[in-house]
Design a protein with these regions (language model features):
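An acidic, Gly/Ser/Thr/Pro-rich helix-cap/linker signature
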Residues: 1-96
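Solvent-exposed, acidic/flexible segments
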Residues: 70, 74-85, 94-97, 101, ...
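Substrate-binding/active-site groove segments that recognize
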Residues: 119-140, 152-155, 159, 183-186
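Catalytic and binding regions of secreted/periplasmic enzymes and modules that target cell-wall glycans
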Residues: 159-186
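Primarily a LysM-type cell-wall glycan-binding module
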Residues: 229-259
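LysM (lysin motif) carbohydrate-binding repeats in extracellular/periplasmic proteins that recognize
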Residues: 249-276
Length: 276
């Protein structure tokens, strides 16, 4: 009996030592319970931004948790990003905008053609008057807010105009939510020129921090508990342009003659108001 007890103790001791000496690697499940620490700084729009202020860290912590633990929507955003970032990124580069702005339509619409309660539409969420101001066609037949390429170009022009007005890309991002006039007014009466030095309304005060949280998670998904090997990403749409010189009387027949159907035509031409 004594020998048996001694053997059990030796076995337990050996197991304990082997466990202590063995390096325990983080798993997806452990990461989900313990998110990585917030970095002391981040490169945003090509500039180093300090994240050491306690208030900023706590507010950013909230946005990281909100997105890291909202698995269904964050995974869906990753799937959609694989389809739409190849469209957005070349336009940003051509317009000399930082590549980070590809995350903005995730904040605005989760990369979906949606309509807000206020009436903003499309991936970049343009209101009708703002969309027309930035050269988007919006009428009874066409709504280019639903066209990713054209809406992205319009967003680039808005952001460049905003930066010229408020001075930095960070404030230009806030202006995309608050409006250029609203940010300029806040800057004036608060005598401030930096986003993190300003007291803003609830939505705008969270806007850039949500942007940073999305950037951190999308650029380091495994660190935040997303196993990219198991996520099936959406492929970019394969399309071709067809010139039309005259009105089309029967869209269903026109589509059929080109080897597709009306359903596919509607899917890829959401910015057209198609009627029977």
């Amino acid at each position: 009996m004594k020998y048996y007890f001694l053997i059990v103790l030796i076995a337990l001791f050996t197991f304990s030592c082997s466990t202590e000496n063995k390096e325990i690697k983080p798993t997806v499940e452990s990461v989900r319970q313990n998110l990585p620490p917030i970095p002391k700084s981040i490169t945003l729009f090509g500039e180093k931004v300090s994240l050491e202020d306690e208030d900023i860290r706590e507010r950013l912590d909230r946005e990281i948790m909100a997105n890291a633990y909202f698995h269904s929507q964050t995974i869906l955003n990753m799937k959609r990003a694989a389809r739409y970032f190849p469209v957005i990124e070349p336009i940003l580069k051509e317009q000399n905008l930082p590549n980070d702005f590809k995350y903005l339509p995730i904040i605005e619409s989760n990369l979906a053609n949606v309509t807000s309660p206020a009436g903003a539409k499309g991936y970049w969420q343009f209101m009708p008057e703002t969309g027309r101001e930035y050269k988007l066609i919006i009428d009874d037949e066409v709504d280019e807010r639903y066209n990713m390429s054209k809406a992205t170009l319009a967003a680039c022009n808005y952001l460049k105009n905003a930066k010229d007005s408020v001075g930095t890309w960070m404030l230009a991002t806030a202006a995309y939510n608050r409006g250029i006039g609203g940010i300029k007014s806040d800057m004036k009466w608060q005598e401030a020129t930096h986003y993190f030095d300003m007291d803003m309304n609830g939505e705008t005060s969270r806007y850039l921090l949500r942007f940073i949280a999305i950037k951190l998670i999308m650029e380091n998904p495994e660190k935040y508990g997303f196993d990219m090997k198991k996520i099936e990403l959406y492929k970019p749409f394969q399309t071709e342009s067809v010139s039309v010189a005259a009105p089309i009387e029967n869209l269903a027949l026109w589509a059929k003659e080109r080897g597709i159907n009306y359903k596919i035509l509607v899917k890829y031409k959401l910015y057209l108001h198609l009627y029977n």
